[in-house]
Regions:
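Carbohydrate-active catalytic/glycan-binding domains of CAZyme proteins
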Residues: 1-173
Length: 173
């Protein structure tokens, strides 16, 4: 063991550290779609790209550009796969852990998570005194989760996930 280590995808603290990594490769590039750390409550996804499996990865931004809620369409990407027999069709599979909380604005709990992990002890203490019953998820019934499957769209290296009320695999080359 040596003192050497490498950092491939650094972020500061929750909710900005990343989880739920969905890796896929396309045209020689490696992609990661990740989620912030806000429990079962959704948050903006982030797409990153690298030339090799081990990076370094370059963050490209939120693939859900048209999602005004900043919640990845109220879901968390868990997997991406290329559809066999299709020219360039990739599908993102996402979990919608809390369909009962879709009306809860992201800004409400984003601020709480930022304060919860603040370097300022007064901010952390203020969160401990808050009534967090509206966002608490330790008793969430994830058996009620549902799913979102959407096709990916590519522009250069950037990946986009657009909302579609319905779509068919047959509509893609």
């Amino acid at each position: 063991m040596t003192g050497y280590y490498s950092t491939h995808f650094p972020h500061i603290s929750p909710p900005y550290v990343r989880e739920a990594t969905a890796h896929f490769a396309r045209k020689g590039k490696h992609y990661l779609i990740t989620s912030g750390t806000t429990g079962y409550l959704p948050n903006p996804s982030e797409i990153a790209v690298a030339d090799t499996w081990h990076g370094p990865y370059t963050v490209l931004g939120n693939p859900h550009r048209n999602d005004q809620t900043q919640t990845s369409f109220h879901s968390q990407i868990s997997s991406v796969f290329k559809v066999p027999g299709k020219k360039d069709l990739y599908i993102a599979c996402a979990d919608r852990w809390r369909p009962d909380k879709m009306e809860l604005p992201y800004e409400c709990y984003r601020e709480i998570y930022e304060r919860m992990f603040s370097e300022d002890p007064k901010e952390r203490e203020a969160v401990r005194r808050m009534d967090l019953s509206e966002i608490a998820d330790r008793n969430a019934n994830t058996a009620e989760a549902d799913y979102v499957w959407l096709p990916l769209r590519f522009e250069g290296d950037m990946v986009y996930i657009d909302w579609k009320d319905e779509w068919r695999i047959e509509d893609y080359e």
